[in-house]
Amino acid sequence: MSAYLQTQDLSVGYDGKALIQNVCLEVQKGKIVTLIGPNGSGKSTILKTIVGQLGKISGTVLVENAAMDRLSRREIAQKMAIVMTERIHPELMTCRDVVATGRYPYTGALGLLGERDKEVVQASLDRVDAGEIAERPFSAISDGQRQRILLARALCQEPEIIVLDEPTSYLDIRY
């Protein structure tokens, strides 16, 4: 079975300076892969590079044997969702609105949601036990609730790959 996601001799870093070199990963569909290391070791930098948020220094990232840099943003968003540790700060959006942004790769130019999109949004909220906060402003919920909403947004994309950077950070103990 060929890997769904691969990196080949990937070098990552900032301002053209490679901090980590020769990263080679092969991730099979349906598998969970973790990057473990101390703070500051480059795990987030590797993840940001894999998903295209940070330019690579050298090497290749392949998704379904296609080079990531040849895929459109829409194609990438249909294949891959990401939840990073950086917090988003949407103004005037409810939690449902934030989750619904996960459907944008599947909508038309105006981003209007169809009935199926609305069903997927609700199902994603329910999967993370966040239905009761769906209509609350995103800015008015706890960090743990925000993390659940961001996880719901990733699920709402219905991607083949979900990249999570410290996914349990901010989660409330009682949930």
Regions found by a protein language model. Give the residues of each.
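Helix-to-loop junction immediately C-terminal to a conserved catalytic motif
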Residues: V51
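Catalytic Walker B motif of ABC-type/P-loop ATPase nucleotide-binding domains
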Residues: I162-E166
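Conserved ABC ATPase signature
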Residues: G111-L112, P137-I141, Q145
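The feature captures the beta-strand-to-loop junction immediately N-terminal to the Walker
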Residues: I36-P38
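Conserved ABC transporter NBD signature motif
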Residues: G59-A67, I76
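Conserved ABC ATPase "signature" region
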Residues: A100, E115-I133, E158
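Hydrophobic anchor residue at the start of the ABC signature
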Residues: L151
